[in-house]
Amino acid sequence: MPASSIDSDQFRRILSRNVAMPLGMGVLSALVFVGIIAYLINVLSWVEHSERVIGRANDVSRLSADMEASMRGYLLSGDREFLDPYTLARQRMGGDLTNLARMVDDNPAQLDRVRRIRTAQNEWELYAEEAIRRRAREADVVDLVKSGRGKNLTDEVRRQFAQFIEAEDSLLQERNSSSRNVIGWSVASFLAFSLIVAGLLAW
């Protein structure tokens, strides 16, 4: 075989070893790294989502508490200025619960809890409207308050909110744990892959 042919074959092998292989491994390493980062971002986005859901649920829960406190203040004083927070909160409540439902529409269990919150809140609002009408007519509201119906309805609203937030907090803890695990195995996997690539290039 002519020497030039041998030299050409050797040159191609050297070129493949010193240029093509490192370039291919570099591209493969980049793809692996991008895949790991994309997966990690996805996991962290769900953590952030749960945090937003919990924050929104707490806001809506406070809105409900403001309505209850405002209504109680009016029943005690008869001053309609006490109803301003109640009126404003009532105008927002329906829309805020709808937005909360949209945030968890991928989770049937949480979506059902929002429906139960809405039902409990609507029942309380019916009671509140009845109490406010009685007070406006200067009718006796003592018996209505003493019946305990308002307290029971308020407790039910709070219980439903607490169950929703507790369930979402459990999801948050699971997702936080998952994100830590992903970070751990991602770093270990990438280091192992890098060592394998380095070994192949050195071989």
Predicted regions and their residues:
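Transmembrane alpha-helical core residues of multi-pass small-molecule transporters
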Residues: 21, 25, 90-91, 193-196
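Heptad-repeat alpha-helical coiled-coil/4-helix-bundle sensor or tether segments in soluble regions
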Residues: 63, 74, 83-148, 152-156, ...
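Cytosolic-side ends of inner-membrane transmembrane helices, especially those
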Residues: 196-203
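Amphipathic alpha-helical segments and their boundaries
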Residues: 15-67, 103-121, 182, 186
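Juxtamembrane amphipathic/coiled-coil helical coupling segments that flank
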Residues: 3-11, 36-48, 68, 128-191
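Short loop-to-helix capping motifs
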Residues: 78-80
